[in-house]
């Protein structure tokens, strides 16, 4: 910013603010635009593809205030932080301090990827988490908060689990110290998944400061009421709040107290399993083809977010799982109710996020009207559910609540509207307030009032061509032709033109003042009434939050009922046993593509490890994944795609399926495979579920076979997990002779007339045939290459020299 010309007062003000927010793009409010100057302007014009201009030698660009959210959205999604500088007074108010006084401006908030509140910038069915990681005395903790809903959780962790934690939480922004980000394990994870990173020095994460921040934000004198918090937990929660305070300039919504995320309450899904099982995205990053795309029948935004949270952290408590299953079964068995409930849900807005915007004063009139309609719908839900005298749904009736008085008030005050900006007005019923009614009458009937006054003056002066006109210089004025002089003391001469004479009157000036000021006065009054409505809603904030949670659950669980009815899912038996018995199980995603061959599996304690051999393309990987997915679906409280299912609670799911090169970070496919397998054998328990596909394939035959053999022995003898292994090493089938709880299966294949048919069916036994040349033929290899491969394979089988 080296510019030689004299700096204007406006630029002095801008530069003073910019120096305070150097890491941000500064949106500086000038009238109806947000302006950017100097380097900010050059960068923003390039990124947003908007015109870059110059005033003197100062580069500048701008975006209209009324459409700024779309520009903000693009910048924030690209990882930029934007400081919003607003005018804190009108030019008229500034002039009262002196004719040349500069309008006061200041930054009112900083918009970052993890602190967004605007509905248009948020994905409806995605949580927008801000996350923080700290290390205090070599003890790690992680916390995540969603400003738009108030959700706030924390947990202790360790370096091995941070990648799984981050994938499960999927934050939009990660707050971290300079020292931590230098650690290879953390740095590689942050870069690999392209999380937006905000770095501070280690002093920002000080435990004592964090303690004081927590007490200050929640208005308490001690943290004892939050439980026995460790130093690292205090540091991570307090640092997160300190950052939010800084970005919101102290204007915080009411947040939930931070809740400990109990590892024992939820199934742990490691990072590899989250990727390999394609819970939220396919390996190529697409939503289509993922599990969530196949099971998400939620209608509301908050229901969709709850489903994602549940899928990333399934329950690990049989009682809680069966409570959900009871509700799903209730709706499956009461189809008329289920359909009525689903239809009612279609009119429900995003209660959680609307309520947060109300709390921080950033809601719109259309938000309040949407909330009014939503609370009406929740009353309908209560009426529907209360007809059934059963404990399964009675809890919902209590939590949904009733808002008759609040809804009546909102109905009496609000006009059905889609007004985004409270300062636009036009959303309060005129008859709600006498003064407002008068202002709006003046606005709506100003032409009539002017015409009435014109007719009155025509009668007084007896000049029938008398007109009342308006321009920006004179305002309203009376005009008569030049040959008509008005000799009435009430008519004050203003202007004589060649063909006309213009007058004004005190009565006309008073009416003009009323007309011009009526709109401003009406808007001011509407803003005041709007504020009163917001205060009334905030008084019910805790109950409305409870209602939002109940709506989310009803939506998610009725969506499970829809899934069960539409695709013939069945209720699983979930208990505290070690069972994993699935009859006629199906893959919840693959079966949507057409005919699917169902398969059985029984990982009883006496055969808790299954070893599957067979050719590629026969369906081994699909079978492995389908059983892991069935286990996950059962643990979120959903029915499952099977004829029957009996599943003992799973504490952790591990998956080593499919290639996932990390060459960009210096890791080969084989190294990634070994690292993920090491994580499994170091963490799996006898309550875990493990699927492993083609362990050892990335190295020499003897190395690979030896590693695969020893891994199976370890999981069988030490971890004692329920596990399914798929392998092309047919030698591993000998393990059933020395390990008592292993059983061999293979993929059924039929051959006739030189043709091979993969039946995708699991049968007992093993096979040493890989059918690789047949797969190559299906892939389109030239016949000459296939013939040569056949010839070489025959030589290998006969132990002949390949060079002869």
Swiss-Prot record:
A single MF term (Gene Ontology): mismatched DNA binding
Pfam families reported in the protein's UniProt record: MutS_I (PF01624), MutS_II (PF05188), MutS_III (PF05192), MutS_IV (PF05190), MutS_V (PF00488)
Alphabetically ordered keywords of this record: ATP-binding, DNA damage, DNA repair, DNA-binding, Nucleotide-binding
Transmembrane feature ranges: none
Residues involved in ATP binding: 614-621
Listed GO biological process terms: mismatch repair
Classification via InterPro entries: DNA_mismatch_repair_MutS (IPR005748), DNA_mismatch_repair_MutS-lik_N (IPR007695), DNA_mismatch_repair_MutS/MSH (IPR017261), DNA_mismatch_repair_MutS_C (IPR000432), DNA_mismatch_repair_MutS_clamp (IPR007861), DNA_mismatch_repair_MutS_core (IPR007696), DNA_mismatch_repair_MutS_N (IPR016151), DNA_mismatch_repair_MutS_sf (IPR036187)
Family statement: Belongs to the DNA mismatch repair MutS family.
Stored HAMAP family: MutS
Protein purpose: This protein is involved in the repair of mismatches in DNA. It is possible that it carries out the mismatch recognition step. This protein has a weak ATPase activity.
Protein name in the entry: DNA mismatch repair protein MutS
Gene for this chain: mutS
